[in-house]
């Protein structure tokens, strides 16, 4: 079974790689990139700090990384919101994040209660992942593929289920067991599953950004620069896609007349648009 160090370092390194890749696409002006970059930066910093639980003070080795994880979750949701053309709901998310951080600090320095800490972070992460999935499933303003957005939403929902399972697992445990709770078989399995899902969650924005750039390039190629009307090639491709070729004896004259009439309408629309531009 993987050691805790490997389980934590693999998602951290993945977040670092994703940060570099997203930073290289920063100039594309796709909404949400900046939030996703900072989310992965915080994730890459927070996870290694958890390995120094017994070497550093609790404020640095326990509280700080969890506060960074709370902020990373909020920024991930913000990136998903901006990507589909919506504003993040900060009036709800910001107080929720602040309350979780305050509660987490209380259950470290006032009452040492590990199940309560896990429950706070898991429930908060579940809420933010649900909000991110809801945003990704909405219709975006920009032309994009629905398949990749659905896949990214499915990854978020899968990670949400892992967080819910961890919260349910820790809820009935005895807080007096202390850090032995982290060594239980159930927790180790859930941590491994979460560590496997986290890299996929970090890499989902790269898929979304690349798909958005391809959709914009495809839209630019398929449109006339001056008038914005559909190009002849794009029109022919769309006709062939919606009206598959038929045998000559079955197609008859109706299909050819429909094609010719639509082509004539497209030609007239494009030239009238050019005349308006020229005028």
PLM-predicted stretches and their roles:
Residues 237-255:
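Active-site-proximal structural segments of metal-dependent nucleotidyl cyclase/transferase enzymes
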Residues 1-15:
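Hydrophobic transmembrane alpha-helical segments in integral membrane proteins
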Residues 16-33, 47-181, 198, 204, ...:
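Juxtamembrane segments at transmembrane-helix boundaries
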Residues 249-278:
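Catalytic-core segments of nucleotide cyclases and related cyclic-nucleotide turnover enzymes
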Residues 218-237:
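Conserved nucleotide-binding and Mg2+-coordinating catalytic segments in signaling enzymes
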Residues 1, 184-194:
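Short aromatic-rich membrane-water interface segments that cap or initiate transmembrane helices
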């Amino acid at each position: 079974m993987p050691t805790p160090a490997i389980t934590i370092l693999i998602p951290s390194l993945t977040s670092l790689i994703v940060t570099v890749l997203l930073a290289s696409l920063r100039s594309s002006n796709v909404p949400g990139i900046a939030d996703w970059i900072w989310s992965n930066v915080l994730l890459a910093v927070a996870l290694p700090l958890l390995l120094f639980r017994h070497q550093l003070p609790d404020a640095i080795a326990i509280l700080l990384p969890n506060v960074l994880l709370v902020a990373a979750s909020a920024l991930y949701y913000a990136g998903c919101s901006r990507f589909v053309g919506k504003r993040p709901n900060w009036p709800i998310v910001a107080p929720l994040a602040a309350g979780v951080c305050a509660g987490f600090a209380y259950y470290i320095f006032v009452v040492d209660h590990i199940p309560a800490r896990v429950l706070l972070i898991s429930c908060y992460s579940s809420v933010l992942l649900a909000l991110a999935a809801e945003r990704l499933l909405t219709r975006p303003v920009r032309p994009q593929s629905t398949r990749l957005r659905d896949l990214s939403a499915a990854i978020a929902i899968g990670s949400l289920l892992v967080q819910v399972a961890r919260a349910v697992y820790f809820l009935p445990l005895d807080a007096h067991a202390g850090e032995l709770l982290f060594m239980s078989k159930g927790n180790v399995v859930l941590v491994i599953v979460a560590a496997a899902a986290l890299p996929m969650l970090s890499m989902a924005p790269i898929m979304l950004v690349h798909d958005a750039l391809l959709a914009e390039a495809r839209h630019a190629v398929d449109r006339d620069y001056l008038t914005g009307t559909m190009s002849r090639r794009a029109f022919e491709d769309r006709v062939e896609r919606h009206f598959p070729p038929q045998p000559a004896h079955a197609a008859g004259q109706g299909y050819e007349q429909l094609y010719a009439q639509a082509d004539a309408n497209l030609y007239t629309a494009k030239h009238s648009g050019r005349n308006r531009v020229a005028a």
